[in-house]
């Protein structure tokens, strides 16, 4: 009879294996917030950098005005 009681205790022990899966769930969210924020910063940084480069190209367009001054005298 003692053997049968031991056999019943063996199948009952498997239930404790269920609690471990609960640990991976709370661990997953903690690992996502850490690696998620760093990659988001490097991507948005390179985009805002190109706009300033375009502003520098705008000043060189001012030189054309002097050429227009030479054009009016020719029309005279």
From Swiss-Prot:
Encoding gene, per UniProt annotation: Sprr2f
Domain of life of the source: Eukaryota
Single GO biological process annotation from the record: keratinocyte differentiation
InterPro entries: SPRR2
GO cellular component: cornified envelope; cytoplasm; nucleus
Source organism: Mus musculus (Mouse)
Principal localisation: cytoplasm
Region (3 X 9 AA approximate tandem repeats): 21-47
UniProt function note: Cross-linked envelope protein of keratinocytes. It is a keratinocyte protein that first appears in the cell cytosol, but ultimately becomes cross-linked to membrane proteins by transglutaminase. All that results in the formation of an insoluble envelope beneath the plasma membrane.
Tissues where this protein is expressed: Expressed in uterus.
Induction behaviour: Up-regulated by estrogen in the uterus of ovariectomized animals, with strongly increased expression detected in luminal epithelial and stromal cells at 6 and 12 hours after hormone injection.
Annotated spans, Disordered: 53-76
Name this polypeptide is given: Small proline-rich protein 2F
Cell compartments where the protein resides: Cytoplasm
Keyword Nucleotidyltransferase listed: no
Key words of the record: Cytoplasm, Keratinization, Repeat
Family: Belongs to the cornifin (SPRR) family.
The keyword Cytoplasm is assigned to this record: yes
